[in-house]
C-alpha cells in the first residue's frame, strides 16, 4: 500500500479481513465437522513423506494439517489446548468457535459494533457456565462406578473402539483407579501418564489386556541374568555402561610398549569401578538408556543382578517417579569424584520378565512411591493400534476428570439445547445492545445437536426442534423439570432421557470448551487489520544467478 506511510506488504482492513477470518475458521470447522458424534466418520491424513494416519480425534486431525492462514491457526491451537487441558471435546470446541464467529460476522454486517458483540458473548458465556453448574450437573456419588464406565463409553462411542465399548470402558476405569494417589493437600490425584500403553499388532481388539505394574518393552541384557527379582532395588541411569574410551584428540606418548596394556587395563577398570559402586548399594535391577557392553554384563551376571539396556527416556522417568528412584546422568558429584548412594535407588516388590501376548516384557510390580498400570493393545494393523491408543488416552482423561470434579452432565446435545433455550430467554430480559449478541450465542450452540443429527443421517431440523421443545417445557414448567436430561438418541433418531441411558460427559469438558471457544472467537473478532509483510529481499543487487542472466549483467 503506497501512501504517506509505506508498508512493505499487503494490508487488508475492516470488513474484508473479518470475512476472511470467518471463512478460514469455517473451513477448519468443516474439516472436522463430519467426525463429531457416535456415528462420525474418520479422516485419513497423508503427510509429505507418505506416512498415513487414520483418526477421528479433532486435535490430531488439526495438528497434522499444515495451515497457512493465521486465523485458522488460532483454531488449530484451540483444539490442541482443549486436548492438553481436558483431553476430550476437541472437535466440538472448534465447531462452536467457528459458529460463534460466523454469527458474530452477521451482526457486524448489520452495523453492530464488534465491541458490543464481544461483551455480549462474554456475558453469555458467563451465564451459560453458571447455568450448567446450577441446573445441569449430576453428582457422581449418586451414580457410583457405573457413572465412570458410562462417561468412558460416551467418549469412546465415536472412536474405533466404540463397538467394544463395555470391555474397554471397564479396562480404562480399572486403570485410572489403579494409579490413584493422594497429594500433599490430601486431594486424590490420577496421573494419566502413569498408565503405559503398549501396542502389539495381531489378534483382535478384545484380546487387549490391563496389567498391574509398569510394563517395559525391553528384555534383560543377557540370558544368564535372573528373570525374576523379588524386593527389587532399582537404579535408573541415563548413560551407557561401556568400556571407557579416551576422547578423540587425546594423544598419549608412550616410551615403553608394556604401558599400552596398562592403559587398556585402566580403561576397563574405570567402568568396573562404576559398576561395583552401583552394586555395592544393593542395587539388583539396573535400567539404563544407553548400551551395556559384554564386559559390563559379565559383572552383573556374576552379581545376580538384572540389567536392562536401551530403555526409553520417557519410560525411565515414569519408573523413577513410581519407584522413588533418582535418574542419574553421571556418577560424578560436585567435587568430580564418582559416588552412588543407596538413597538414589527406587524400590519395587517384584521385577519379572514375562511373555505376554507374543512379546517378552519386563513388568515392574507394586512400586514404592506410586502404583502404575499398563495396557497392552492388540489390533489388526499399526493404524488401528495408533487410533486405539488415541481413543484410550481420551477416555482415560475423561475418567480422570469425572473423578476429580465429581460431576457429569448429560451428553447427546442436551446441554447445548438447554443453554440455547435459557440464553434466548435471558437475552430478551436484557435491554442493552448485548441482547442480539446473546441471542446469536444461543443460536450458535445449536450447531452441536445439528451436526450430531446430520452425521447420523437423521433429519436435523425435525430432531433439534423436538429437542428444543422438550427443554423449553423443562424450563417453563417446574413440574416437568426432569425433561432437562433429554438429549438425542442417534441410532433411533429420536430424543431420549440421556441420564437414564447413561450418556455422560465430565462437566469440565463442557465448561472449558465453552470458555475456550468464546475466547478464541473473541480473539479473532477483535482483529480489524492484517498486515502481511513481504519476505525480505536480499541486499545483493542482482540476486541469484538466473536473475543475473535475465538482467544481462553477465554480458558485460
Curated annotation (Swiss-Prot):
Name by which UniProt lists this protein: T-complex protein 1 subunit alpha
Biological classification of the source: Eukaryota, Metazoa, Chordata, Craniata, Vertebrata
Modified residues (Phosphotyrosine): 181
Xref: InterPro entries: Chap_CCT_alpha, Chaperone_TCP-1, Chaperonin_TCP-1_CS, Cpn60/GroEL/TCP-1, GroEL-like_apical_dom_sf, GROEL-like_equatorial_sf, TCP-1-like_intermed_sf, TCP-1_chaperonin
Keywords recorded for this protein, A-Z: Acetylation, ATP-binding, Chaperone, Cytoplasm, Cytoskeleton, Disease variant, Epilepsy, Hydrolase, Intellectual disability, Nucleotide-binding, Phosphoprotein
Keyword Glycosyltransferase attributed: no
Annotated catalysed reactions: ATP + H2O = ADP + phosphate + H(+)
N6-acetyllysine carried by residues: 199, 400, 494
Amino acid at each position: 500500500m503506497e501512501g504517506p506511510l509505506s508498508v512493505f506488504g499487503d494490508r487488508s482492513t475492516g470488513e474484508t479481513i473479518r470475512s476472511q477470518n470467518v471463512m478460514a475458521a469455517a473451513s477448519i470447522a468443516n474439516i472436522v465437522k463430519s467426525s463429531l458424534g457416535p456415528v462420525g466418520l474418520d479422516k485419513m491424513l497423508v503427510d509429505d513423506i507418505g506416512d498415513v494416519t487414520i483418526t477421528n480425534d479433532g486435535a490430531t486431525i488439526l495438528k497434522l494439517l499444515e495451515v497457512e492462514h493465521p486465523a485458522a491457526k488460532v483454531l488449530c491451537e484451540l483444539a490442541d489446548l482443549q486436548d492438553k487441558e481436558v483431553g476430550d471435546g476437541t472437535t466440538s470446541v472448534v465447531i462452536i468457535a467457528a459458529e460463534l464467529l460466523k454469527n458474530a460476522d452477521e451482526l457486524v454486517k448489520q452495523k453492530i459494533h464488534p465491541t458490543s458483540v464481544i461483551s455480549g458473548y462474554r456475558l453469555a458465556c458467563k451465564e451459560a457456565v453458571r447455568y450448567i453448574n446450577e441446573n445441569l450437573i449430576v453428582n457422581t456419588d449418586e451414580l457410583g462406578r457405573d457413572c465412570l464406565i458410562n462417561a468412558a463409553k460416551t467418549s469412546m462411542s465415536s472412536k474405533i473402539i466404540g463397538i467394544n465399548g463395555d470391555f474397554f470402558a471397564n479396562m480404562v476405569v480399572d486403570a485410572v483407579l489403579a494409579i490413584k494417589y493422594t497429594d500433599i493437600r490430601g486431594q486424590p490425584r490420577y496421573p494419566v501418564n502413569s498408565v503405559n500403553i503398549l501396542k502389539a499388532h495381531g489378534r483382535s481388539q478384545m484380546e487387549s489386556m490391563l496389567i498391574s505394574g509398569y510394563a517395559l518393552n525391553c528384555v534383560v541384557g543377557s540370558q544368564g541374568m535372573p528373570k525374576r527379582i523379588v524386593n527389587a532395588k532399582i537404579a535408573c541411569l541415563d548413560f551407557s555402561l561401556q568400556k571407557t574410551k579416551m576422547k578423540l584428540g587425546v594423544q598419549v606418548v608412550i616410551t615403553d610398549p608394556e604401558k599400552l596394556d596398562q592403559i587398556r587395563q585402566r580403561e576397563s577398570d574405570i567402568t568396573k569401578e562404576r559398576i561395583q559402586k552401583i552394586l555395592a548399594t544393593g542395587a539388583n535391577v539396573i535400567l539404563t538408556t544407553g548400551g551395556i557392553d559384554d564386559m559390563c554384563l559379565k559383572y552383573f551376571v556374576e552379581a545376580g543382578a538384572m540389567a536392562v539396556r536401551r530403555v526409553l527416556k520417557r519410560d525411565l522417568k515414569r519408573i523413577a517417579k513410581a519407584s522413588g528412584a533418582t535418574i542419574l546422568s553421571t556418577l560424578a558429584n560436585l567435587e568430580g569424584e564418582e559416588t552412588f548412594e543407596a538413597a538414589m535407588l527406587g524400590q519395587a516388590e517384584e521385577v519379572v520378565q514375562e511373555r505376554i501376548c507374543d512379546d517378552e516384557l519386563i513388568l515392574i510390580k507394586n512400586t514404592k512411591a506410586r502404583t502404575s498400570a499398563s495396557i497392552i493393545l492388540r489390533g489388526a494393523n499399526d493404524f488401528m493400534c495408533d487410533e486405539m491408543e488415541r481413543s484410550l488416552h481420551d477416555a482415560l482423561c475423561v475418567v480422570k476428570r469425572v473423578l476429580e470434579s465429581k460431576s457429569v452432565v448429560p451428553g447427546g446435545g442436551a446441554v447445548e439445547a438447554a443453554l440455547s433455550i435459557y440464553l434466548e430467554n435471558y437475552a430478551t430480559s436484557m435491554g442493552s445492545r448485548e441482547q442480539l449478541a446473546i441471542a446469536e450465542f444461543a443460536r450458535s450452540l445449536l450447531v452441536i445437536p445439528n451436526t450430531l443429527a446430520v452425521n447420523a443421517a437423521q433429519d436435523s431440523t425435525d430432531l433439534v426442534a423436538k429437542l428444543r421443545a422438550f427443554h423449553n417445557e423443562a424450563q417453563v414448567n417446574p413440574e416437568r423439570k426432569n425433561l432437562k436430561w433429554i438429549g438425542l438418541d442417534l441410532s433411533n433418531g429420536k430424543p431420549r432421557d440421556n441420564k437414564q441411558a447413561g450418556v455422560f460427559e465430565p462437566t469440565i469438558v463442557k465448561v472449558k470448551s465453552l470458555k475456550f471457544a468464546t475466547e478464541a472467537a473473541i480473539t479473532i473478532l477483535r482483529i480489524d487489520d492484517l498486515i502481511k509483510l513481504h519476505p525480505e529481499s536480499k541486499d545483493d543487487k542482482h540476486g541469484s544467478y538466473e536473475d543475473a542472466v535475465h538482467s544481462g549483467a553477465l554480458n558485460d
